[in-house]
Amino acid sequence: MGSGLPSKSATGHGKRIGLLSLGWGCLLLTASAACAAAPIHLASISRSHHHRLHHRHRGVGVQPNLRSTEALVLDTTSHKVLYARRADVPVPIASITKLMTTLVVSEAKQPLDEELDVTSDDRAIGRGASSRLAVGTHLSRAELFHLALMASENRAAHALARNYPGGVTACVRAMNAKARELGMIHTHFVEPTGLSSNDTSTPEDLSKLVMAASQSAVIRRYSTSRGYTIRSGRHMVAYHNTDSLVDRRSWHIVVQKTGFTNAAGHCLVMQAVIDHRTVVMVLLNSWGKYTRVADARRVAQWMKAKPGHHVIRQVASRA
């Protein structure tokens, strides 16, 4: 296809990804000078203590009834907020953290075809951490990107951070520095997987991360991949995307990431094209496994029913 990226393996096949010796220059799209000069500013939102803004344009109609506790829908062209709920409240973000991990690792421009090992250090990343990657598994850096973004593989994300120049500590430091660079003033990271409830952010901040991540061809490709199979130990292990919307032809998703912990609830962030408009959705702390996807569908249906309107509703300040 001429993208210069390592080729994807078809789902269900035990073929390793085709590795190519590539320069990172073709993988990362450089943001415009204007974007680099200043952080993205969202539409003005009231921040008075315990204040909620309920604003509705005359004749607009009913807002989407979302189940996510914190949410934001942003038009990336106009930078206008179409929908917001508790958009400036810092909360745990679970594996949405991996979007920042892969962003800073990609910017280090380490070889994608370099073979890396999954070690016991990657196993000891947190109580109850799920992973199907056996210690001793050999994977390329590209494959670790693939699994961390598509399947939210905890050991894959940790291995990427562990092999970052300076190790995990340096990677987390770079993640926080990148957050400041992007204007994510209410975001803080303590580790690279999202398993810690101390990895926190707001919907407003995460919209900036999603837009920055959308500039990376690696993140775009692997976060929207449908499936991939690897050899882990003695077994072939098939992985699938944790976001079922990538399988829907009716959805044009540019970049996405899911997350879940007990502290964070079910989370989903994405950049998608809906009704010819590019939007960022941030949906945090949904109460059910399928609620985050249902909320995304509610937003899409609302946008298609009310094209062209810019509405802000249910915005709460930090308590």
Residue ranges and their predicted role:
Residues 16-17, 99, 272, 278:
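Hydrophobic alpha-helical segments, especially transmembrane helices
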Residues 18, 128, 140, 167, ...:
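Secondary-structure junction/capping motif
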Residues 1-70, 305-319:
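N-terminal secretory targeting signals
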